[in-house]
Amino acid sequence: MQEQYRPEEIESKVQLHWDENRTFEVTEDESKEKYYCLSMLPYPSGRLHMGHVRNYTIGDVIARYQRMLGKNVLQPIGWDAFGLPAEGAAVKNNTAPAPWTYDNIAYMKNQLKMLGFGYDWSRELATCTPEYYRWEQKFFTELYKKGLVYKKTSAVNWCPNDQTVLANEQVIDGCCWRCDTKVERKEIPQWFIKITAYADELLNDLDKLDHWPDTVKTMQRNWIGRSEGVEISFDVNNYADKLTVYTTRPDTFMGCTYLAVAAGHPLAQQAAANNPALAAFIDECRNTKVAEADMATMEKKGVDTGFKAIHPLTGEEIPVWAANFVLMEYGTGAVMAVPGHDQRDYEFASKYGLNIKPVILAADGSEPDLSAQALTEKGVLFNSGEFSGLDYEAGFNAIADKLAAMGVGERKINYRLRDWGVSRQRYWGAPIPMVTLEDGTVLPTPEDQLPVILPEDVVMDGITSPIKADPEWAKTTVNGQPALRETDTFDTFMESSWYYARYTCPQYQEGMLDSKAANYWLPVDIYIGGIEHAIMHLLYFRFFHKLMRDAGMVNSDEPAKQLLCQGMVLADAFYYVGENGERNWVSPVDAIVERDEKGRIVKAKDAAGHELVYTGMSKMSKSKNNGIDPQVMVERYGADTVRLFMMFASPADMTLEWQESGVEGANRFLKRVWKLVYEHTTKGDVAALNVAALSEDQKALRRDIHKTIAKVTDDIGRRQTFNTAIAAIMELMNKLAKAPQEDEQDRALMQEALLAVVRMLNPFTPHASFTLWRELNGEGDIDNAPWPVADESAMVEDSTLVVVQVNGKVRGKITVAVDATEEQVRERAGQEHLVAKYLDGKTVRKVIYVPGKLLNLVVG
């Protein structure tokens, strides 16, 4: 074997071997336990970034480890290939989204191969191909026939100048990103899937997900937002309809002093006809998109509609206001306000001088002080007529029952979750398979006309979707009648909601899934991806699985048994201030730094001499120019080094700080492993290991070897603390480097140790392990080698360390046989000269012995 570790020579050879031998291609095999390891599929943006590398390295380590346990391991990869960035890039580069996307896929595929990931490339899929999205279109038409799909109007961002819909990220400070025109909100018809029909199941089944992070489950619980409350109807003077509100706190109902409706509510619209201030306010609300997340922090505004509602229990008139914190698409578009006991209602009432009435006592039984804020805690009712003196639960039930008896209240379970709007007014997505006849009848596209293919040879003007701009594309015939195709495309979360299932049968032509293959591989055993997908993708992913189950395609309730959310990758960030005061971010690669004795950066400049401001470690991003190109690192150190650093530098679910010094450390370690194997193999043949003939020192080393195997197995398999597994291997390597190589049993023991080390490193550093395994004459290829098994008998300690005390003070430590008697331990202690001098001339009055641990001699 060559003396030096040269990753640039070995890695490409090993990758070629995997390709030619189709090492990681798998098929269903009922005789083997399956393991489906999946990392979230990448968007083909053009280049891999370190976040990808971390995600896919974690997945590959787990997949290779499970394979070495003898399981049938599926680890597929594909491309989440539709989406808005391709449209922008196509316009910028004067091309179409399709060629840009396919070029990126080709480039990134090479990058994935360069990193040595053990994927089954025969299952590769790209979601932008008709072969993939045809099944999604067919499934959508089936959901429509089941009543799970409907169309309704919904608000979008509209640019009046370009006459086009804008995605949220295309609205900059309320204006169109292209022409800077003020963006309006416009209601247009859109398609929805009834995820709310599955709200209870999506909520309850979270309890089955024992191996999902609690943070993700909590986020989904809150997003689904199940609540129990009462829906209450109010009569309104001079208004034909009743006003309905939903509350989870009917116990506070006697403190309701005003109602608030959304700007889009029919009552507000009616009132605005004679109220210019209200009309202007409604206009302002319409053109301000408010994300629900921003609701809590934005300024609360409102206008009195002039209408008065009648409180059903007190008969009092209470004002109805239009307010910007009420959304038409949530609940009934109206809320009751109890400013004494809700902070938002309190702030609004204080701002506009509305009545604040306390109806819940403070915890100490006194009237609450509402001079600065609302009392939001539950408590005993007062100031509430017949309900005064009741506690929260009794008050809730008594008021709910009274309202029900009067016919103006009904107990209801509510959800925050809204149906999934899947329409996008973009081009680069799967066409929605619906048509409209000349008489306005809407129908699903007939099966014989599927897939509805998105034309790829298009010209992008950056404004209108090519399929909307071309009237001919929409024309079709259904049952002999002329019809127009839907020109909206699917939300790209559609494609990523079921790709994991299609990987089980990517070539299947008879339908969306081959149930036999799907049920062999599913559910996914471990799914790896970022926590930023906790509510959108991971909720749709669970929802789609249930839809496919109810269509008879899969027989499990949940798509993935375990979810591992990897931490972000951070890097140093630097900038200098330009002539106009702007920040110019400089790549950490180009920063020349000075450090103090603790290694902290104290000064930095770039090659041009700019003094740099160091802002600390932050997430790698384009905006801060602190991304490190994985390809450059692989070319410099090799894929195995990059992979090893990624897994060693931090626990998988914590943030990872990119430090090139750490990468260099990982590289030095691999060179040490290589050198030890080289020195060992160049000494010639190795005798068989004779365990019975080992010396005490050799037994101790063998004990360390097998304890390391046990620890690494537990760390990777059960605990998934990969960094501590690597640390244990490094510790063992330090011992092996110092181990004598005098006689043939020393060398036989070294052979056993190195075969174990190379296999334990295989999930992390597969190229080096593959090569070293062959040099050590391991059986077959390491890709088919079994994981090393710890020899229990080798780990048994035949001696133990006993602490010796005289009159309670430690005077020495002795090594004795594990099965030594108390007499033998006392005798051995007396021979220890440090102990003996404290016993000299004294009488032992009492002996306290804790077997195998402590001997305390009380003398006088």
Swiss-Prot record:
Q: Which GO terms describe its cellular component?
A: cytosol
Keyword field contains S-adenosyl-L-methionine? no
- Molecular function (GO) terms listed? aminoacyl-tRNA deacylase activity; ATP binding; leucine-tRNA ligase activity
Q: Could you list this entry's UniProt keywords, alphabetically sorted.
A: Aminoacyl-tRNA synthetase, ATP-binding, Cytoplasm, Ligase, Nucleotide-binding, Protein biosynthesis
Q: Where in the cell is it found?
A: Cytoplasm
Write down the Pfam families for this protein, in alphabetical order: Anticodon_1 (PF08264), tRNA-synt_1 (PF00133), tRNA-synt_1_2 (PF13603), tRNA-synt_1g (PF09334)
Q: Catalysed reaction per UniProt?
A: tRNA(Leu) + L-leucine + ATP = L-leucyl-tRNA(Leu) + AMP + diphosphate
List, alphabetically, the InterPro entries matched: aa-tRNA-synth_I_CS, aa-tRNA-synth_Ia, Leu-tRNA-ligase, Leu_tRNA-synth_edit, M/V/L/I-tRNA-synth_anticd-bd, Methionyl/Leucyl_tRNA_Synth, Rossmann-like_a/b/a_fold, tRNAsynth_Ia_anticodon-bd
Q: Where is this motif: 'KMSKS' region?
A: 619-623
Instruction: Establish whether keyword ATP-binding is in the entry.
Output: yes
- UniProt GO BP: leucyl-tRNA aminoacylation
Motif range ('HIGH' region):
42-52
Give the main EC class: ligase
Binding site residues for ATP:
K622
Write down the CDD domains for this protein, in alphabetical order: Anticodon_Ia_Leu_BEm, LeuRS_core
Query: Might you give the EC number(s) for this enzyme?
Result: 6.1.1.4
Cross-referenced HAMAP family: Leu_tRNA_synth_B (MF_00049_B)
What the record says about family reads: Belongs to the class-I aminoacyl-tRNA synthetase family.
State the name under which the record lists this protein: Leucine--tRNA ligase
The organism is Klebsiella pneumoniae (strain 342)
